[in-house]
């Protein structure tokens, strides 16, 4: 039995080789250069093909309740963070033909070779400092008008975790101020021959209740999303790794 011990939900069980990678001061989240867009399109095609192969043939993921997404092109999708590579590919395959943008840690851009390509594939790195936050928020607001935005509110990868960690309200301001729906994507695990079977459940749409203040709406939406993920996480029937608090 594989047991891992943690102190808080902020603990990391997976770190990239360049965990302290910093964005350049002049980093641009939206690049309008036509040549950049052409290269990004060319790079995205083999990435998408590999994603389908990895998700369907290696991880053997089953998607449930995709019908809830059918009517929508732009929305925020909140997911539990439990697979190192799978969390990069599963949303792209699950949401196809829509191209999602995924909010990621800047450390991902420090990965040799592939790190430089990630922004072309839809990665939106979180800025390190306040001075870059305005442009980051502008990018999220623009992208959310036309595409799905994927957010992992738990922030840290806990491989094969079968419970939903408590998370902050911060990222729920985006769907509230942009008045777009939110959905959940909950990865669950069942016993397999060698590694767990993976079943992913979609749920939604979720909107905040008609409350007096933006702060109340943000909390209300966060609670709806959290409760949905907790509900669907109950479909996990096998603990490949057990997490215990110190």
Per-region residue spans from a language model:
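Soluble catalytic domains of membrane acyltransferases
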Residues: 60-220
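Membrane-anchoring hydrophobic helices of lipid-metabolizing enzymes
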Residues: 1-78, 86-90, 115, 120, ...
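A conserved mid-domain beta-alpha-beta active-site/ligand-binding segment of alpha/beta enzyme cores
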Residues: 226
């Amino acid at each position: 039995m594989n047991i891992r011990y943690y102190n808080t939900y902020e603990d990391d069980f997976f770190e990239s080789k360049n965990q302290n990678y910093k964005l350049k001061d002049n980093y641009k989240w939206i690049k309008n250069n036509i040549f950049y867009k052409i290269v990004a399109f060319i790079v995205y095609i083999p990435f998408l093909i590999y994603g389908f192969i990895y998700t369907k043939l290696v991880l053997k993921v089953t998607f449930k309740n995709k019908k809830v997404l059918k009517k929508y092109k732009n929305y925020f999708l909140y997911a539990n963070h439990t697979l190192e590579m799978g969390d990069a590919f599963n949303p792209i395959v699950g949401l196809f033909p829509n191209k999602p943008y995924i909010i990621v840690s800047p450390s991902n851009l420090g990965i040799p070779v592939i790190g430089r390509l990630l922004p072309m594939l839809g990665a939106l790195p979180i800025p390190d400092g306040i001075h870059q936050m305005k442009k980051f928020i502008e990018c999220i607001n623009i992208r959310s008008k036309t595409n799905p935005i994927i957010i992992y509110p738990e922030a840290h990868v806990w491989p094969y975790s079968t419970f939903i960690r408590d998370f902050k309200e911060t990222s729920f301001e985006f769907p509230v101020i942009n008045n777009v729906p939110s959905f959940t994507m909950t990865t669950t695990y069942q016993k397999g021959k060698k590694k767990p079977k993976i079943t992913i459940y979609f749920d939604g749409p979720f909107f905040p209740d008609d409350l007096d203040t933006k702060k109340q709406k943000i909390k209300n939406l966060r609670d709806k999303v959290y409760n949905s993920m907790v509900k669907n996480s109950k479909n996990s029937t096998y603990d490949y790794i057990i997490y215990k608090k110190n």
